[in-house]
Curated annotation (Swiss-Prot):
Pfam families associated with the record: Ribosomal_S19 (PF00203)
A GO BP entry: ribosomal small subunit assembly
Localization in the cell: Plastid, Chloroplast
Family: Belongs to the universal ribosomal protein uS19 family.
UniProt-listed Gene3D superfamilies: 30s Ribosomal Protein S19, Chain A
Main location: plastid
Name of the protein in its database record: Small ribosomal subunit protein uS19c
Species annotation: Cryptomeria japonica (Japanese cedar)
Gene Ontology cellular component list: chloroplast; mitochondrial small ribosomal subunit
Length: 97
């Protein structure tokens, strides 16, 4: 279900204040955050934000195409290891016996 239009996009206050300080000083530093639910706003363009994936912080460079998406969309929380392979060797041994 989509978010109501009368509500603004959510951005963590701490994250927004860090972005504003860097923009005022015209600095480019990596910002570390745990706020995966924060939306990407135009003030963040050009910055690198390290978002927590549950284990470590992964850096994301913010570009124009990412506006109005959430930070957590760009950092996977789990890695697909593949499906379990069938053990053919044990089946062949059972058939021979």
């Amino acid at each position: 279900m989509a978010r109501s239009l009368r509500k603004n996009t959510f951005v963590s206050n701490d994250l927004l204040s860090k972005i504003d300080n860097l923009n005022m000083n015209k600095e480019k530093k990596i910002i570390v955050t745990w706020s995966r639910r924060s939306a990407i706003v135009p003030a963040m363009i050009g910055h690198t934000i390290a978002v927590h994936n549950g284990k470590s912080h992964l850096p994301i460079f913010i570009s124009n195409g990412m506006i109005n998406h959430k930070l957590g969309e760009f950092v996977p929380t789990s890695i697909f290891q593949g499906h379990a392979k069938k053990d053919k060797k044990s089946k062949n041994e059972k058939k021979k016996n």
